[in-house]
Amino acid sequence: MAHRELDWDALDTYFQLGYIPAPATPFREVRKLEPGHTAVWNRTRGLSTRQYWDLPRARTPTPRDVEAHVADWLDESVQAHLVSDVPVAAFLSGGLDSSAVVASWALASDAPRHAFTAKYFGSGAASADETDLARRLAAAYGVTLTEVDIHPDVRDLLEPITYALDEPHADESAVPTWLLSQAVGASYKVALTGIGGDELFAGYRRHIGFLMGEHYARLPRTVQRGVSALAHLLREPQGASLSVDRLKRFLRPGNGCAPDRFLGYLTRFPNPDRHALYAPALRDHVSGAAASGWFRDLYQRHGAPAGLSAALYLDYKTFLADDVLALSDRIAMAHALEIRVPLVDHELVERVFPLSDRVKIGLWRSKRLLKRALKGRLPEQHLRAPKRGFVGPTAAWLRHELRGMIEDELAPARLQRLGYFDPTVVRGLLDDHFSRRHNRAGILWALLCFSIWHRGYVETPPARPPVPEDSEYVPHAKAAR
């Protein structure tokens, strides 16, 4: 049996990214199997792994009427994922990807269709709610829509969510995913989702930023230094997110090779701030460079792809695999629900991924190819809507409904007992967030999730804490036609 010695290079990556990439785990003697790999145990040779699938490397010519081809490929993938012995439901956030999947589903089948969406209430609800778009899409295609009400009193959910995930995981979408999976799983055993559309069709702001960064990196170093000096003078607006900090890192002179630049976009809590977070006794044992080494290795393994392909490849191998897919699958299975991901189907990926960068994205327009393919199929409002992301309003929750909980979990006495973190630094992060001087939701959520996980997996006997069949939180659901 493996010892429960913590792997602090892996955990440092967790505090940097919000998740732990495979093959690492929180424990030094435990490893995960990477996606697209098989593992074979032989009595004499021991354990060996082999990669059996990867994203295609070669470019393919862009066919004429590529938008029509993409629409057909999407329909084929959704139809393949509808094959089931039991009724199928769908997650519908109102965003472009889930709307595209539901539209294809409606075109493929005349059977009754039922989708579920999140409706937020309380602190920060307006910033997260996409119910109006979900309602419009459901009405356009005759889909029964159940709105799952999400209130900010989620304190009792965090422990069962953490235990379902098995390891520290700081993605703020965990709470709405849990409540939606709970609601869907009460009536269905299979559900479609729109996961994977951002990674396949270049839907994140970081993809545009990455391409801009490639042009910026070609400027003379003296120009870069001047722009960086001006950016350093920018003050972060009260209550601002990470945007100003990321801009400063983006404009840093000679801001690294392609994998390091992309890692900068994914980083939630950078060095040296992260290094200062740790207790003095721990700092010398944390290199702070584990994620960079891992990203560079992935990049070289795939032949150092250029342009947008580098960003999309790293997104697939890191964020999609170890954050989004891992979280959604584990939470859904905690409710005996199988989620299906037609936008991650290997046949669709093998057709779309090798297409030209210029087809997929414009200088200021993400998902250009997908939006053109869906023109006439989705309402114009869906095609123009800004991206929000499927996350709850955790910044507001931490300032209000969850404030007492995080104050308890990160109390100086508990931190001193754990011995991992500097209580003064943590207190400063809390004060920054509560006073709205800075938005510290990302690192505070990561610390909160780690504390809950540590109590269940390190401080208690090694037996896995049970995941309740149902949490005490009962979401309010209402159906609309």
Language-model segments: which ranges?
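Short, solvent-exposed loop/turn segments at secondary-structure junctions
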Residues: 96-97, 120-122, 152-155, 197-200, ...
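Active-site proximal helix-loop segment of RNase H-like, two-metal nucleases, encompassing DDE(D)
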Residues: 165-168, 410
